[in-house]
Amino acid sequence: MAVAAYVLIRCRGGKEDRVLSTIRQKPHVKKADLVFGDYDIIAYLEFDELPSTFSVAELNHIVTEEIRKVDGVSSTSTHIVTTKFSGEGRG
């Protein structure tokens, strides 16, 4: 089963478009959108072909080293998906 996570991203004022463009280019980011609310961007990360040794520590590394260090990012909140649902139920 693939590991997936949502990363909620706060940006410094005026940096949202640049951050979004940069985040969308990251290899594990499948989707990223600007949103209204407490956060500015919600990114969906998915790891399709994982080695059996993949760990949350590796996800943490990707978030802290590849996303938080993007110029304009002020903070993030990561939420790991535990169960996926499709339009027809679980899946």
Feature locations, PLM:
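A compositional/biophysical signature of low hydrophobicity enriched in polar/charged and small residues
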Residues: 1-91
